Structures are given as structure tokens and as C-alpha cells.
UniProtKB/Swiss-Prot annotation:
Pathway: Amino-acid degradation; L-arginine degradation via AST pathway; L-glutamate and succinate from L-arginine: step 4/5. NCBIfam families: arg_catab_astD, PRK09457.1. It catalyses: N-succinyl-L-glutamate 5-semialdehyde + NAD(+) + H2O = N-succinyl-L-glutamate + NADH + 2 H(+). NAD(+) binds at G221, S222, S223, A224, T225, G226. It comes from the Bacteria. This is N-succinylglutamate 5-semialdehyde dehydrogenase. Belongs to the aldehyde dehydrogenase family. AstD subfamily. Catalyzes the NAD-dependent reduction of succinylglutamate semialdehyde into succinylglutamate. The gene is astD. CDD domains: ALDH_SGSD_AstD. Transmembrane segments: none annotated.
Length: 486
């Protein structure tokens, strides 16, 4: 099966065999082979050869191609949404919104490109001080499995608009979505070599990340893999590296008047996408006392009634399967480990069907437990009770991560205090943690990434500034510097 796209041609991989099944029922979806190191090299060389003409084409012409890609996405929205839903296990309604977001990224990227990396000029005596931006050249995009369309698209679109050529290495858990997406790029008329697709797992990733022909790498995924890439790129200031990674995100709840409103926002924060968003709440901080007891009881009641099902089930489920049986096994083990460390199960996460990756939401009180500073990437929420807001902030900040944090409170004063004292790239007030504006930068600090590689500021990583002093004519200065005689 032809699963690679190199120099405008679909090719069979020479690497290890790959297969993808639906995580909800193990139905076969896709087969192919990974790219070998030689094929990765061929993809990078083709991208390098295609880069000069693509960069010289000009933004207006490049934008026409990218807009045609957007038109193909719109035409095939239903088809691509079904691919994403089957491959990830997420409900069809959610996969459909993912494709819609991919289309919307085009106009946002054009606006960001103009604002963040456009051209500026100012008079400077008899000359002009001009700021322009140039593309890096060949960049790799490493995509994640949780949003296999939207998240790599968030790097590919601005990178192409800026004039780069791109090598796309998707997660080995979502090869089908990547293949279908690249087909749309080819249909849109992207010149041969400007985008390449190399499938594969670790070996493919190592070959691509270590290739001398790369000018940059944009990564979305786990903190462990991101840290390895950061180490690999150390001492290489000639290469741009963007890292968007995970988080052990805290959400602080105060004694709000609208209890069900807060419960809803916690549900959306912790369990949307089966808890497989990097901004999902992992630690819920609830005040001690009767109000907190009642709030937790209501949360457990609502979470226990959430509909879990296959992507196309009717009525539609709120959450579907996690990405794989291995992921489900790891989450169930994490739940057991938290209990063994002193946690109290409030709502036990369980597997709905043996051999399938559909999990019900889990909630564990870990107030008295030894809590590992890890991201449990799934529908598993820890509840931690706090005595006062000082303690809440201390607990919230007790993490090496720094992606998202938030406060559900009727007090603006408490939110302002948390905003000031928190260390995170996304800080929300009375909104789910998983909510973010496409017109804002996205990313984290600490173990969550190197600042803002995604969303509106992605443009910053796709081109570098060039400062120029320009004068239409050459003339001898009226006054010479001391020591010069002409």
C-alpha cells in the first residue's frame, strides 16, 4: 500500500509494517509501511529542491494554493470527519468540529502572518529602515494523535504560507488521517516536494529529527519525547525548534453560586475528548467543608451519567474511546497506582468492553495521597481539597508543567491573584480549561513547551526577521568620519 508522499508521488514504505484499527471495536482501518531512513532522506532532499521556487512564488500565489486546500476540506468535511472519528475513537460531532477548525486556520494564519511577520518600513535619514521576514527552508512537523487533523494543520498551514516546504511525520496511531489530509494538499495543486509525508514510529522520527537537511522542527506531543528532541537540538542554534507538550493542569473551584455551571465546566475541562486534550484539567482543587462535599458529590453524580460510546452511536456520546488499548491499560494502571498511593476512588474508571479502549470517567480524591507530577492523558481526574486560597495556589503551582490553569469563582480578586502567581501559558476564569482563542498564542512553559509555538504565534516560528537599511542611490556623505580622506 502506498502510504508515503515524496516529491509529489505516492510510494510504499520500505520500513516496518504498520496497521491501524478503530480503538472502540478493533475494526481494521488502515495498513501500510513506515518510511525507511533512505526514504526520509529522499523526502528531505525533495523538499529542499522544491523550496526555492515555492518561496519565490510570493504570498499571494501561495495563499491561492492554501485556499484551494481549504475548499477541498470543506467539500470533504463529512468524509474526513468520519476518518478522524474512526481512527481516534472520538464522537463524530467532535471530529466534524475539528475539520471546521482546520478550514478556519487558513484565514487566521494569513492574518497572523501579516501582523507577526509582515513588512514594516520607516524613514531613516536618506534611507529606509525595512523589516521583512524570510522562510527557514525545510521544516518538519511532528503531529499528535489526539487532534490528527487540526494540530499538525496548525503548523503546516502557516509554514507553507511563509514559504517553507514541509515534511509531515504524523503519529503512528493516526496514519489514515494524515494520508487523507495530504491527498487534499496534492489535489489543491501544491507543487511536488513542497509537502512530504513520512509514516512511522520511533525509527522514522529519529531519522527525520536528526536529518542535517532540516532547518526546523515543530513538535506537538508528550513532554518525554519533546524533552528528547530539545536535548537532541541543543547546541544547534541554526535550527528552529517549537515544542507544544502536555500539562498536569490545575483547576481551582471556589464556593460559586451556580454549582451546576461549575460542574459543567469541570466536566468539559476534564472529560471532553475522553480527557485527551493537553489542556484538560488533571487536578481539581475543591475547598474543604460542606460546600465542597456537596460540590464533589454533584460532580460525581453528573460524571457517572456521561454517555460513552462509539463515534457514530445514537444518541451521540459525550466521549468515545481513548486512542488505543495500550493507552486504556496505562490509564487503568494509573488509577490503581493512585489508589495504592493513598487515593480514595469517588468514581471508578472502568473499561466498557473487554479488548476495547472505551473507558468511563474516573475521579479519585488524592488529597491525602502521594501525587506523582505526571500527565494522565485520559478521563482520569484527581480531586484535591484545600483549606484556603493560599494553599490552593501552592498546590496548583506544585508541578514542573506550565500549560493551563484556571479558576471557577465569583471573585475577580481571587482570579487576579491566581493569574499573577500562576505559571502557565493559558489561564482561564469561569471558562473550561480546554477553551482557547484562535486569535491568541497557545503554548506553555516548563515541561509544557518552549513558550508559544502554536495558534496565533505559530507564524513567529515559520519565518525569521531580516532588518535592512535601503537607499535608492549611492552617494558620498556630506560629512566624513574622522580619519577618512577622500
Amino acid at each position: 500500500m502506498s502510504s508515503l508522499f515524496i516529491d509529489g508521488k505516492w510510494l510504499a514504505g520500505d520500513g516496518e509494517a504498520m496497521a491501524k484499527t478503530n480503538p472502540a471495536d478493533n475494526a481494521p482501518l488502515w495498513q501500510g509501511r513506515a518510511a525507511s531512513a533512505a526514504q526520509v532522506d529522499a523526502a528531505v532532499r525533495a523538499a529542499r529542491a522544491a523550496f526555492p521556487a515555492w518561496a519565490r512564488m510570493g504570498l499571494e500565489e501561495r495563499a491561492k494554493v492554501v485556499r484551494r486546500f481549504g475548499e477541498r476540506l470543506t467539500e470533504r468535511k463529512a468524509e474526513l470527519a468520519r476518518v478522524i472519528a474512526q481512527e481516534t475513537g472520538k464522537p463524530l460531532w467532535e471530529a466534524t468540529t475539528e475539520v471546521t477548525t482546520m478550514v478556519g486556520k487558513i484565514d487566521i494564519s494569513l492574518k497572523a502572518l501579516a501582523e507577526r511577520t509582515g513588512e514594516r518600513a520607516a524613514a531613516m535619514g536618506d534611507a529606509q529602515a525595512v523589516l521583512r521576514h524570510k522562510p527557514h527552508g525545510v521544516v518538519a512537523v511532528f503531529g499528535p494523535y489526539n487532534f490528527p487533523g487540526h494540530l499538525p494543520n496548525g503548523h503546516i498551514v502557516p509554514a507553507l504560507l511563509a514559504g517553507n516546504s514541509v515534511i509531515f511525520k504524523p503519529s503512528e496511531l493516526t496514519p489514515w488521517t494524515a494520508e487523507e489530509t495530504v491527498k487534499l494538499w496534492a489535489e489543491a495543486g501544491l507543487p511536488a516536494g513542497v509537502i512530504g509525508l513520512v509514516q512511522g514510529a520511533k525509527d522514522t522520527g529519529v531519522a527525520l529529527a536528526g536529518h542535517e537537511g532540516l532547518d526546523g522542527l515543530f513538535f506537538t506531543g508528550s513532554s518525554a519525547t519533546g524533552a528528547l528532541l530539545h536535548k537532541q537540538f541543543s547546541g544547534r542554534p541554526d535550527k528552529i525548534l517549537a515544542l507544544e507538550m502536555g500539562g498536569n493542569n490545575p483547576l481551582i473551584v471556589g464556593e460559586v453560586a451556580d454549582v451546576d455551571g461549575a460542574v459543567h465546566h469541570v466536566i468539559q475541562s476534564a472529560f471532553v475528548s475522553a480527557g485527551q486534550r493537553c489542556t484538560c484539567a488533571r487536578r481539581l482543587l475543591v475547598p474543604q467543608g460542606e460546600w465542597g462535599d456537596a460540590f464533589v458529590a454533584r460532580l460525581v453524580e453528573v460524571a457517572g451519567k456521561l454517555r460513552v460510546g462509539k463515534f457514530d452511536a445514537e444518541p451521540a456520546p459525550f466521549l468515545g474511546a481513548v486512542i488505543s488499548n495500550a493507552a486504556a491499560d496505562a490509564l487503568l494502571k494509573a488509577q490503581d497506582d493512585l489508589v495504592a498511593a493513598g487515593g480514595t476512588p469517588l468514581l471508578a474508571m472502568r473499561r466498557l468492553e473487554e479488548g476495547a479502549a472505551m473507558l468511563t470517567p474516573g475521579i479519585i480524591d488524592t488529597t491525602a495521597a502521594v501525587r506523582p507530577d505526571e500527565e494522565f492523558f485520559g478521563p482520569l481526574l484527581q480531586v484535591i481539597r484545600y483549606a484556603d486560597f493560599d494553599q490552593a495556589i501552592a498546590i496548583a503551582n506544585d508541578t514542573r508543567f506550565g500549560l493551563a490553569g484556571g479558576v471557577l469563582s465569583d471573585s475577580r480578586e481571587l482570579y487576579d491573584r491566581y493569574w499573577l502567581e500562576s505559571r502557565a501559558g493559558v489561564v482561564n476564569w469561569n471558562k473550561p480549561l480546554t477553551g482557547a482563542s484562535s486569535a491568541a498564542p497557545f503554548g506553555g512553559i516548563g515541561a509544557s513547551g518552549n513558550h508559544r509555538p502554536s495558534a496565533y504565534y505559530a507564524a513567529d516560528y515559520c519565518a525569521y526577521p531580516v532588518a535592512s537599511l535601503e537607499c535608492d542611490s549611492l552617494a558620498l556623505p556630506a560629512q566624513l568620519s574622522p580619519g577618512i580622506v577622500l
